[in-house]
Amino acid sequence: MSGWQRIYYKLLNLPLRVLVKSKSIPAEPAQELGLDTSRPVMYVLPYNSKADLLTLRAQCLAHDLPDPLEPLEIDGALLPRYVFIHGGPRVFTYYTPKEESIKLFHDYLDLHRNHPDLDVQMVPVSVMFGRSPGREKGEVNPPLRMLNGIQKFFAVSWLGRDSFVRFSPSVSLRRMADEHGTDKIIAQKLARVARMHFARQRLAAVGPRLPARQDLFNKLLASKAIARAVEDEARSKKISHEKAQQNAIALMEEIAANFSYEMIRLTDRILGFTWNRLYQGINVHNAERVRQLAHDGHEIVYVPCHRSHMDYLLLSYVLYHQGLVPPHIAAGINLNFWPAGPIFRRLGAFFIRRTFKGNKLYSTVFREYLGELFSRGYSVEYFVEGGRSRTGRLLDPKTGTLSMTIQAMLRGGTRPITLVPIYIGYEHVMEVGTYAKELRGATKEKESLPQMVRGLSKLRNLGQGYVNFGEPLPLMTYLNHHVPEWREAIDPIEAIRPSWLTPTVNNIAADLMVRINNAGAANAMNLCCTALLASRQRSLTREQLTQQLECYLALLRNVPYSPDATTPSASASELIDHALQMNKFEVEKDTIGDIIILPREQAVLMTYYRNNIAHMLVIPSLLAALVTQHRQLSRTEVLRHVETLYPFLKAELFLRWEKAELAGVVDALIAEMLRQELIVVDGEVMSLNPSHSRSLQLLAAGARETLQRYAITFWLLSANPSINRSSLEKESRTVAQRLSVLHGINAPEFFDKAVFSTLVLTLRDEGYISDTGDAEPEETLKVYRMLADLITSDVRLTIESVTQDDA
């Protein structure tokens, strides 16, 4: 680089350092994309822009990547480390410099022909200032066009703080040269593929143009399905066609989002400021798989679990900072109050009622609107649980919106729809106190401005947040495999409900819940809560708590729940220090050391966090319970117990394994428990290790309440085999409530209606009861005896005394 060029770049860099604050995507490009900085690296940019080049340089230097302004020296030849695919427009359009990208690609490929050991890593890089998609009418060009110098100056001045540098996975020029050759035609193909790559990347980052709201309504009104529904509305309610059409427009106004890029930018600033003060960090995992889906042109439907109202904002914020378009979000109509409703609407929320029953016009308008979002290529987000979990466990899925998603596919759309399950975890959920009150019978408070202000005023240190993207579920692939004839039901006008739709939707929903749990995140808060709630006094010395966390961490690291699940890299001691900063626990000091206490009033609230990872530890807890209670038993007996109880655990906690996989899982966990010296193994026989009995007992306590709940239902069923399902659920809950009072069980989900409903349905599915309610007394009594051996004698006596009291 000449001296004049250095001076030019230094002068240009002065205003950029002030105006531009860009973000790298991914956050650690070398690590996440597997770049080997010991090998040559070159950068490919979409078009000639010195501002883009210097913005890229700043990020490269910040992440220890090679400086793009430093040329590559290969065998005495100096080549630029960057290539612009397109020369880009200029102020004077008649002057366009000669495009050099093809020549540079050819030079690089030619060097690979002459040097067999050479392997240059070609890294495509997009630098974006602002991401407004523009409107379908009004603007001639979208804002992300190739800008000339003056346009670029204004873009950088106005949008420099809303910019990012997107690094794509590298391409090996050695592989290109070996597989495709090194002549000029290959260089031209390389440039053409790069252009397509950048065009797709721009679309993934900004999304399609936004429609004028009224134009969208007019298009929906013109659809045959809504026109027919309007006619039915006029006829059934005996009103004029115009009045029925006005009703349809009013419903569109109620439902439709009013997406605004400026509102996204403003909210991003506010949230960035807020997150930095409330959260100690937002941990994001597996975002690259979603970026790849967007790049490949998939219609993405985000399906997160629902913990808090914060989910709406957090997920959009995370996606925006991953270089993706914030989705259109299905939000409950209860959030459509001033001022939250209009703000959420501009952030992409469209509102959905709790029920569609009895309102054909509403269901038709909503279905057509959702279908229109898909056909235009907007990403969509909805909570398949239907509402926020009050217990910290996943709720049974509500399948209405998922069913409409598949019906949208049956319109014959060409873009593949892919469902992306997402696990959202927090170390503090702001509504957790309200949830506990509602579970105890308090009426749910209606969302309103005063309630929102009260909630915001209580926000303090929220610890860490977690957003883990699970394994995507491509709908077309799923239907091709499970319903090969699905294309026969395609109808571009009618909302088709073929016979296979309901069972298929139910199976997909259950699969999604499993995939959400597969992406679970263990953290300091849920691990500490699990350990302290396992102690009957809700207190442990610091040494005991450290030892127990080490046990959990070793289990989760050495026998991971799933490939997508995450476990903290910090030590047990560091996690305890972090959890204590959250001010949920009390510490008593004496001459021996610290005692960490979970106060009684906090215990119920902390079950929420324990339940977030209950599925990740329930099988190790069951194994620990078997060894603790039996003291000694064979592997065969252990597996028999696990296989008997697993269907109920799987249904309740959306566990990932099939029955055939259990033997391998159990063997791996036994090996880990042996490594930790929690148990002793002599041939086929496992027994308790007395020197580590406390850790094993605390681990076993994770399954204690679940086993007690199962024991209640199996005892009632064996005592009264002809009891109907409804009565069995009701009586099980009554006994559970009594048990919680008599034995100090502080978990609200212990007598949760939904938990017993799932249990009774699983009893039917597993053949313990029939549809008429008649039970198999021998089988139920056998399972009850198995469960009775795993619970304490006082709890067992309380359960068995119920039927005696009734007698």
From Swiss-Prot:
One of its GO terms (biological process) is fatty acid metabolic process. Pathway: Phospholipid metabolism; CDP-diacylglycerol biosynthesis; CDP-diacylglycerol from sn-glycerol 3-phosphate: step 1/3. Its main location: membrane. Keywords: Acyltransferase, Cell inner membrane, Cell membrane, Lipid biosynthesis, Lipid metabolism, Membrane, Phospholipid biosynthesis, Phospholipid metabolism, Transferase. GO terms for cellular component: plasma membrane. Its EC number is 2.3.1.15. GO terms for molecular function: glycerol-3-phosphate O-acyltransferase activity. It comes from the Bacteria. It is a peripheral membrane protein. HAMAP family: Glyc3P_acyltrans. NCBIfam families: plsB, PRK04974.1. This is Glycerol-3-phosphate acyltransferase. It comes from Klebsiella pneumoniae (strain 342). The lineage of its organism: Bacteria, Pseudomonadati, Pseudomonadota, Gammaproteobacteria, Enterobacterales.
